[in-house]
């Protein structure tokens, strides 16, 4: 067996096996968005609010707040209106519980609704941010604002960029609480909570923030989740530089924490951190001020099917006639790289790690950064992927050059190798020994041909991860029918790639996998042409593997994101060009058309037999 073909087949087979196992175990998930919120009365809408003692290891209280569900929709509201957000703040509890993202729609349809980020209690799968004060010395639960407190609008009208609003509430005992909300041009809210002690005695209270998310049904399901192996959905937290990721299913498995009175996992932060919930493209995060010690916790209320993320700051003591305030932040929006990076530069510790870069983060991060920079210049993600491929091929070219030169030398040595085989006869040991001596003498590495293929495996999976998790690829168009590079090729042989007046098969169906689109077809052709740089192997087994490999890959990758298939086509095309030029420059002229012709001739001859 030709050593070069043997190694090439082994490398190709390994790539095929890795992708096949991945495809079988973790098929591409259906690309679904969270449905529009339907208003419905939902039982069990209570959230667990901490007490000041909870910051010092004491037990928290779980007030009965079921009455909040039917009243939230009727409560007075303060509108939120920015270039990128719209929604409202409920004066019942001062909740930020209605928020939509103006720049994103649930689908590519022209009349598709914009994405809802937060929804009030009483809606399907409610999701909201709640702030308050846990009572300490001199106060009880009725003396501090909680989830059902009726706040008054003290100043401001509509919460917008540069126009904050202030809410106030007095407890009737001389203590006044205020909450000032501000929002920037993207997705960050600034929440300033203050307390003014007009009573005759000192008081203590601990400011807290809560993100609450209500599950549906017995399993506490959350609509719109992908539930896909390579994607983290659930709690994401940064604790003094250490990232923690806890899937929703694992949150439901928490042990009861006696200090919290609930299923919980608690983190003690010395100076920096944040905690929240992350989905495929969207995230809500509580961010205390940098340099502040605080406690954060992820909780699950099994009875009410509520997931919670909370931060509790140390108890603040306020003397009579004095006041105190604390400022924290809330991120609620899309996980855009530019926005997240800007917030990280503004002091949110390692905020870019909230994007799920995966196991190959050392590759996915630079690959996305490079793709993002190219897209900033070109303005089209499809052409940017091709540009990225060119740059990657240029980076690995020194290694590829050695491989292609070695392959060319192997072709030059073909007559000597055939002579060794004839001289050795059936003595395989003698033949192998002679081959090794020949390789050593001519300084040829017979395994060099597999290196370019093996290099593609980590790059392929890293780019797959980038295309799947980054919102910049969501609904990113290329040209013509390719309106979303994060989705499979929408074209099909069934309607001759859109030229015939009927619809193609439904995306993700078996029919769509069989009646492939134009991109998978080009992928198969590009792999087939790349094979034709060399004559077909004389060994029948090798020849059969080579013959089937391009078309198997074509159908396998047909259901992958079209952006990934574009990368593979570009990679094959560049590899073909590089290999052709290098092999010619070293004295071996690939006879592509001759190899194609001989392949058909050999097949016709086999059919006659």
UniProtKB/Swiss-Prot annotation:
The chain crosses the membrane at residues 8-28, 381-401, 451-471, 509-529, 545-565. It is found in: Cell inner membrane. The keyword Transport applies. GO terms for molecular function: membrane insertase activity. InterPro entries: Membr_insert_YidC (IPR019998), Membr_insert_YidC_N (IPR028053), YidC/ALB3/OXA1/COX18 (IPR001708), YidC/Oxa/ALB_C (IPR028055), YidC_ALB_C (IPR047196), YidC_periplasmic_sf (IPR038221). It is a multi-pass membrane protein. Keywords: Cell inner membrane, Cell membrane, Chaperone, Membrane, Protein transport, Transmembrane, Transmembrane helix, Transport. Required for the insertion and/or proper folding and/or complex formation of integral membrane proteins into the membrane. Involved in integration of membrane proteins that insert both dependently and independently of the Sec translocase complex, as well as at least some lipoproteins. Aids folding of multispanning membrane proteins. Interacts with the Sec translocase complex via SecD. Specifically interacts with transmembrane segments of nascent integral membrane proteins during membrane integration. This is Membrane protein insertase YidC. It comes from Ruegeria pomeroyi (strain ATCC 700808 / DSM 15171 / DSS-3). The gene is yidC.
